Amino acid sequence: MKHRNIVIVLLLVVAVPVAALAAAPAGRQRTAIGKLTIVADSWAGPLQGPWTWAGDVTITAGGSTLTAGTVKIWLEKGGQRIQRMEASGGVRLTGTYTMAPAGSPPADWKVDASAQEATYDGGTQTAVMTGKVALQATNTSTGEVVTARAGKATYNGKAQQFRFEQSGEPVQVQWQEPPAKAAGQ
């Protein structure tokens, strides 16, 4: 059961959809694409795309937030879905996500993941984080913590498979049990 939870948390973190935010500070560009809100120092590109946001980029959707130095987005024909996204310059993904694995009650996980770069391909539903990938996910009910460190993390949404890799070094994954409950709790 623990191993299934670890796998589900790792899948969730790498597969999390691009994320959510509040109002843009004065002087910053704010753009909405579908259910995404993007705030950055600048936004440029041809009308049909691709578009590039640069300078303290924050993308929000739902309860998730993605931050990076630069983000480039290509939209599918019709402009309603992301065909491809590239983020670079200190990429960070945060949010709280609910999981309900088969046979287990739903659980909320607070997630914080970072990497130097990240890409997403909408056609293959593949997300890749590269360069000092670090992940921490905490079960908000039990206090269980999963951490992972790797050089690269890949998630294929269609196949629902993930892979953490580290060139020449082992991938590091740690599971911390929840704190023991005192008698009578």
Language-model-detected regions and their locations in the chain:
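Mature-chain termini and adjacent capping regions
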Residues: 1-185
